[in-house]
């Protein structure tokens, strides 16, 4: 019963099908972990959502920033961005079923010594705190009053975690960490502007996973989000955004032995950072 973790798809449905052929995916016995950003910017967000939802228990998904953007737009919050390719989802006859399914997905998923998130985790959070904070925000997103949070979801502040945070500020830090984080300070302050590869960042910022004494370092973290980072496969993390959207590859890792599989992708968009 192998488990394959798959990088950011962003509506690139055809490469996903080719990748599943490469790994000889069997829905009756195999499992797929999706690191989020199932939709947007690629050509086939609607087909991608329908396909992954149809996998049922064979698929585990965590939410990415583009997935949350879709949920917010459908709820009448946020504003469409140049380059969005979400109109087909928003106009689909089954949009309510698809979006209801999407907002019930997780922000963090843990099995044994593996942890999956879309972007990152704050270095001051233990593994138990990661799951507890994820559950807080997941309950709001899946609940009856999710629109109240979506109306105030966007924003960078606060940039750091504090146990005393309450309300929307607390939820915003949690969601930003799981879905937007790349760099932070040694003290855990998040930086949201720089998107380049490690080594190009301004002084004082570190990749979140390289902050000294990161409290979740006892887990192997599987994540995406960071196309300029590319594929990384080391003991404490696997990074899986290999730029499918930008003409790179869609990648998967079989967790049992860390074997990497990939298919080349036709460029659907020019990188903007």
UniProtKB/Swiss-Prot annotation:
The keyword Iron-sulfur does not apply. It catalyses: P(1),P(4)-bis(5'-adenosyl) tetraphosphate + H2O = 2 ADP + 2 H(+). Its EC number is 3.6.1.41. Signal peptide: none annotated. This is Bis(5'-nucleosyl)-tetraphosphatase, symmetrical. The keyword Hydrolase applies. PANTHER family: CYTOCHROME C5, PTHR40942. CDD domains: MPP_ApaH. Hydrolyzes diadenosine 5',5'''-P1,P4-tetraphosphate to yield ADP. Belongs to the Ap4A hydrolase family. GO terms for molecular function: bis(5'-nucleosyl)-tetraphosphatase (symmetrical) activity. It is an enzyme of class 3 (hydrolase). InterPro entries: ApaH, Calcineurin-like_PHP_ApaH, Metallo-depent_PP-like. Keywords: Hydrolase.
